[in-house]
Amino acid sequence: MFLIKNFIYLLRIGVIKGAYRKFNFISEYLKVSKVKINRLQFIIYLLKSEIIKKKQKSYLQNKKNYYQKKYNFTDIDWFSPNIPIWDTVLKQAFINKEKIEYLEIGTYEGRSTIHICENFKNFKITVVDPYNEYNEVNSVVKNSNMENVFERFKKNSFNFSDRISINRTTSKEFFKKNKKKFDLIYIDGSHHYLDVKEDLTNSINFINNNGIIILDD
């Protein structure tokens, strides 16, 4: 009875369907490659991976709903899918560090900034964004008014203003004047090749030993 109940539950939430689809796909590959595996263990592994994926999806949706209700965000969300990997890596990387200097290039409404503020209390944050009208955002956000976006960011980050330094300028101009080094740098500004290359080059010069640079490109 226990097995039947669990089977029905897994079937209801769509886990078995996903695992079955993966099993068929990989089984075809194994036939061609002639690799032998324990099929029962493999099926259990696939079921577990599907359960984890479902839980993660539910977690992300709850997180997204929470931020949508609490802050002034639009439906445009490039950051939330990155939350699990960010949380895992950052908690491990900075577990014994009391103060983290974090630089964010490209902030938009502040989803990543707010997530860091709420979940990593020892982070001091420097954000850089000119909030100009630029094509790569407007291709996704039609008629986007960057002044309005900037106002939303200021409202969203108001309660954390003691931890956030806002630099409304280009990353190029920021790095010309900057003298501080950072433990974590997130590059999510211009997505044009030469701009990204320049941001990465500058970031390497201003990253602390054992620091982390994240690129969203």
Question: What kind of region is each of these model predictions?
Answer:
Residues 1-74:
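Membrane-proximal basic amphipathic "stem/tether" segments
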